[in-house]
Amino acid sequence: MAGMGKPYGGRPGDAFEGLVQRIRLIVPATLRGGGGESGPYSPSNPPSRCAFQFHGQDGSDEAFPIEYVLRLMNDWADVPCNPYLRVQNTGVSVLFQGFFNRPHGAPGGAITAEQTNVILHSTETTGLSLGDLDDVKGRLGLDARPMMASMWISCFVRMPRVQLAFRFMGPEDAVRTRRILCRAAEQALARRRRSRRSQDDYGAVVVAAAHHSSGAPGPGVAASGPPAPPGRGPARPWHQAVQLFRAPRPGPPALLLLAAGLFLGAAIWWAVGARL
């Protein structure tokens, strides 16, 4: 996506900060925190440690958009990655931490198509990667298209326990959402066809201009005469007629015609004189 012009700042640090700001916008405001490991990171050099973290206090009931956040991280990165979200019961709060790849020793596999509820006691940890999330979605036979089923974490913090429910939530009106997706796909195809058509037209204009500048006939145009002098436009029909009259035509030289006339006159004069 970098070649398409990502909506992040020009400097690498600004690019990563833009990603963190977007994550802050979609995470509930009651969850505190935001930034993780600091550094001049970019889509081609994402953080190897914690990218962001949020805290939920005791007594809070939050819904964390895990799938949206993980896909946002995956789309931002220009290098292969498998974003991972770790959830920990610290004993006084619940901690959400995001990584571009699962850290060494981090738990995984606790969430399956059959097991979507987890209870964390003090200092216990669980987590889920984007690859495992897609596997669960496929096993459940859910619609994998955007804006359809998306996983959220319902978090209930009641110390010393934290209850987590991993649930897929769909749009309120699935039929209308499918129509929007189909319309968006049709518009994208139409834009692509228009772009290709405009590129073809531009290429034809460039080729014609190149042939015109070199004096050679364009594609599909037969040469009907010598090329026009540089800097002059095509000759008009009346000008072409005048040029035809002005052009020298092949024939005997004038001196030869004069000699022949004199010889013919002398012969006639000799014949008449002989008769007299």
From Swiss-Prot:
Amino acid composition bias (Low complexity), ranges on this chain: 212-225
Topological domain ranges for the Nuclear compartment: 275-276
Membrane topology: Single-pass membrane protein
Keyword line: Host membrane, Host nucleus, Late protein, Membrane, Phosphoprotein, Transmembrane, Transmembrane helix
Primary location group: host cell
Keyword Ligase: no
Topological domains annotated Perinuclear space: 1-253
Region (Disordered): 212-237
A Pfam cross-reference name: Herpes_U34
Positions of transmembrane segments: 254-274
Name used for this protein in its record: Nuclear egress protein 2
An example Gene Ontology biological process: viral budding from nuclear membrane
Family: Belongs to the herpesviridae NEC2 protein family.
Species, as recorded: Human herpesvirus 2 (strain HG52)
Subunit-level organization: Forms a heterohexameric complex with NEC1.
Gene: NEC2
